[in-house]
Amino acid sequence: MLEVLLLALALAADAFAASIGLGSTHKSDVNSQFMKMALLIGVYFGVAQGVMPLIGYALGSTMLGWFAEGASWVAFVILVALGIKMLYESRSVNNDETRINLSHKTLLSLAIATSLDAMGAGFTLNLLAVNAYLACLIIALTTAVLSVLGAYIGRKSGTWLGSWAEALGGLVLIAIGVNMVV
């Protein structure tokens, strides 16, 4: 279960970083408007991060029989590649992008974009001794909570914290991948 919690935290890092950026763009001083926006961010990101690994899990279940012996190595490659991608993206974030139009279309696009990594990670859930549905629920709830928290942090701190969160998430994915083959 520890692996699921670490995976949830790592996968939530993209959404957390994006939420910090979105929170930093909030112009209104009205707390109720900000709270609504933060909760909406949490719902969009949480649902996307919960559904994508489920899709990956379903695809992985289908394909697992085809390469059962090498499955741990495939999971290793996927998680390490995703981790390296997150590390790279954390260094190439443009922190000057501070004004974003926060429509439902924008939130949906960001939620899908930040959850694509979760689909790849969901593929590896077949290799962990966990209930995949419970794991996806944990991933969704973790992402939702961290996204709301990220929006609040972004409102107070600006965007500088987002890239560090994404880098940490990348390192955790790499560590989980290495653990699967050790």
From Swiss-Prot:
Topology of the protein relative to the lipid bilayer: Multi-pass membrane protein
Pfam families cross-referenced by the UniProt entry: Mntp
One MF term in the entry's GO annotations: manganese ion transmembrane transporter activity
Transmembrane helix as UniProt keyword: yes
Manganese recorded as keyword: yes
Main subcellular location of this protein, as a coarse class: membrane
Any GO CC annotation of this UniProt entry: plasma membrane
InterPro entries: ATPase_P-typ_TM_dom_sf, Mntp/YtaF, Put_MntP
Function: Probably functions as a manganese efflux pump.
Family: Belongs to the MntP (TC 9.B.29) family.
Full protein name: Putative manganese efflux pump MntP 2
Species this protein is from: Psychrobacter cryohalolentis (strain ATCC BAA-1226 / DSM 17306 / VKM B-2378 / K5)
